[in-house]
Amino acid sequence: MKYNKFLAVSMSAVLSLTLVGCSTTSSAKELKGEELNKIQKDDKEKENYLVIDVRDEAAYKEGHLKHAINIPTSEIDKSIEQIRTWRDKKVVVYSDDANKTKEAVEKLTKQGFKDVTSAQSTKEYSYEFVKYTTLNSSKFQDALLDTNSNKVFLDAREKKDFDEKHAAGAKNVDSKNLDNLQSILPEDKETPIYLYCYSGNRSSVVSQKLIDLGYKNVYNALDGTKECNYKFEIADCCTEPGTK
């Protein structure tokens, strides 16, 4: 009798664990490619999501979603600090392999991210891709502080905000009037060009124009000055005499 009771309890425990495991798998959130494309096209809605392309860097550079940053699955654990502010917000992960995406979702969840969704893979859905690199605020700030490399900054904000403060050596551009953009660009199309605006939308327009003009190393700030208090230099044109 005792043996039968023990067997019944054991079977019940195994069944419970199995059901829990099945429940976890089936409750994993998934996003259709069509929906993710719509989010990327909506300048306001995209602000509510952090989209991470977890393919390797080479695949990312061949083309990726407009507002997606690149963190390969193998590098997620050591890159958490860069995206820690998104722990309580919506995060969407995609790649060219469902297993990579699943692993990335699991890693982010273990690191405390509460709302992680997997999207259809690039093999399952034909996404609209761009070829410029999208940087999160952490990496863009690093670029601002790095004075050793030969890079160019373009500021796509209104002139009044540009005049107040901007990246060292930055040039102000109007995303709605790019006819004369070529005249302020370096001749060497391998030159790294970094762009920013208020929320990444205007600068993404200019970024695409640069790609169309043949520039190879274009970097757009996902987070603009409304979302991140970047450490900019005060514009020389607006500095009070005797204060420098």
Label the model's feature ranges.
Residues 10-13:
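Gram-negative bacterial Sec-dependent N-terminal signal peptides
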Residues 16-19:
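Bacterial Sec-type N-terminal signal peptides, specifically the leucine/valine-rich hydrophobic h-region
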Residues 2-8, 22-39, 45-49, 56-90, ...:
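Rhodanese-like catalytic fold shared by cysteine-dependent sulfurtransferases
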